[in-house]
Amino acid sequence: RVRVAKLMRKAGLRSIVKKKFKVTTDSAHKFSVPENILDRDFKPGTLGAVWVSDITYIRTQQGWLYLTTVIDLGDRKVIGWALSETMNAVDTVISAFNMAQRARPITQKLIFHSDRGVQYACHEFSSMLEKNPLIIRSMSRKGNCWDNAVAESFFKTLKAECVYQHKFSHREQAALIVFEYIETWYNRKRQ
């Protein structure tokens, strides 16, 4: 170990250490929860058939930033995303979903899958989805991150390849680097 550490230091390399897991999903709420229609079928075959979404956190020296993404399982691209200083539904899931709709208008039956977080279950978001008869809501089973594995996997990749490589002094710096990662690297080259 010591020899490897010395060689890495000499080469200007550093290892990526996985950070301790922090729970960000508040599923202890009174809102209704749709059944898990997706049921881990992560290969829909066509664009616009299944979107998955989740929220993660990014630490900065100014405080937390919360990143919400919407991924189309047809090509695994991040088609909608939002960064927010708060965890409210308007600034997170609604903003990311609206971006996804602008990028890929809903023209066929769509399964929208997420975890059971309060942002996804709240009246503001659920009533917005219910206005479109083409959207079928689906939520992971309680405490089961594997039901939303594609979204979780994207966050693991983002953090290993991007977030953990930086120490963000302010939120704007983190926002710029996350934007560059998603829009110029992940969606265009990484996949």
Annotate each language-model stretch with its function:
Residues 1-191:
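Charged DNA-binding/catalytic regions of mobile-element recombinases
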